[in-house]
Amino acid sequence: MTQGQKVSVGIVGASGYGGVQLVRLLKEHPLVELAYLGGDSSAGKPYSDLYPHLGHSINLNVEAIDLEIIASRCQVVFLGLPNGLACDLAPPLLAKGCKVLDLSADYRFTSLDTYSKWYGKERQDQAIASTAVYGLPELYREDIKNASLIGCPGCYPTASLMAISPLLKQGLIVPETTIIDAKSGTSGGGRQAKINMLLAEADSSIGAYNVAGKHRHTPEIEQICGDLAGHEVRVQFTPHLMPMVRGILSTVYATLRDPNLVRDDLITIYNAFYRASPFVKILPGGVYPQTKWACGTNLCYLGIEVDPRTDRVIVMSAIDNLVKGQSGQAVQCLNLMMGWEESLALPQMCFYP
């Protein structure tokens, strides 16, 4: 695709926080025409009824999900649906010639048995699923360029894998010692009403949830860690809910194989590993990332430290869960699939303060 042709794009499941972020990014993309917004409960409503602040710029209604209409209008379709629905829509859309980017978990796993175990839905589409590419450009850039089906990563896996990938790929740590302590803002829980997301419940409080390997992002993280390490890897992953709207801070701990490695060595290694990755910012020694720095951007900030007392490396990763952790990363994949500049239309300046 040349750098001047507009591509018609549709979003199925545009009513949530990830959906409205995707609408914003695609509306501002110079090579994209937003041609379709689809949904179920919101079908028939102007999009501005859901998000009044967009009434001046988005003149589209949310339409019922109709595969024939979608395929007739759209060259590319983003699926922003709850887990378990995309796997019913993606195969017919692919058969009709659409490229598909799925923001749910349906196409993140190489093993459908793993998916079924964690997400509770039996699948028979292994042939289609096997063609999906995991949409983390910093690891699978070349595969994404040639893909028709992308399984976009989860927000926690994105932040965590960006932190640990260089260590695993180069065999610098003992993989089984990996501990991931991650904290997310409330927008990661979606737009539907939930008691624990109420201001009175979430404000001035921090708490862990889905502890001891119960979070669904655990097998996703372990799958990619295993791919990088060349063998099965188990990690200890504990997520926390923070009293903020946007952002994820993931802190990864692991034991170094070589206790003589120092912080500056690792900073050099990380800079080399991510040298072709425009959205990864390796911080200088002694500087550690904050979620506010990434707010509204597709950036991932990485801070690195070594504790010589314990021979552990500590890597901190900060992203915006709705941008690099979801919609922005999906647009990053779109840019690669279309042969465009990877960073096209993706923000790199944060909302601050």
UniProtKB/Swiss-Prot annotation:
Top-level class of the enzyme under EC nomenclature: oxidoreductase
Gene3D superfamilies: Dihydrodipicolinate Reductase, domain 2, NAD(P)-binding Rossmann-like Domain
Catalysis performed (reactions): N-acetyl-L-glutamate 5-semialdehyde + phosphate + NADP(+) = N-acetyl-L-glutamyl 5-phosphate + NADPH + H(+)
Pathway where it operates: Amino-acid biosynthesis; L-arginine biosynthesis; N(2)-acetyl-L-ornithine from L-glutamate: step 3/4
GO annotation terms (biological process): L-arginine biosynthetic process
GO CC aspect terms: cytoplasm
CDD domains from the UniProt entry: AGPR_1_C (cd23934), AGPR_1_N (cd17895)
EC number(s) from the headed UniProt entry: 1.2.1.38
Primary residence: cytoplasm
Subcellular location: Cytoplasm
One Gene Ontology term of the molecular function aspect: NADP+ binding
Pfam families: Semialdhyde_dh (PF01118), Semialdhyde_dhC_1 (PF22698)
Active site, per annotation: 155
Keyword set includes Cytoplasm: yes
InterPro entries associated with the record: AGPR_AS, AGPR_type-1, NAD(P)-bd_dom_sf, NAGSA_dehydrogenase, Semialdehyde_DH_NAD-bd
Superkingdom, natural source: Bacteria
Alphabetized UniProt keyword annotations: Amino-acid biosynthesis, Arginine biosynthesis, Cytoplasm, NADP, Oxidoreductase
Family statement drawn from the similarity comment of this UniProt entry: Belongs to the NAGSA dehydrogenase family. Type 1 subfamily.
Function text: Catalyzes the NADPH-dependent reduction of N-acetyl-5-glutamyl phosphate to yield N-acetyl-L-glutamate 5-semialdehyde.
Record-linked HAMAP family: ArgC_type1 (MF_00150)
Name of the featured protein: N-acetyl-gamma-glutamyl-phosphate reductase
Organism per entry: Microcystis aeruginosa (strain NIES-843 / IAM M-2473)
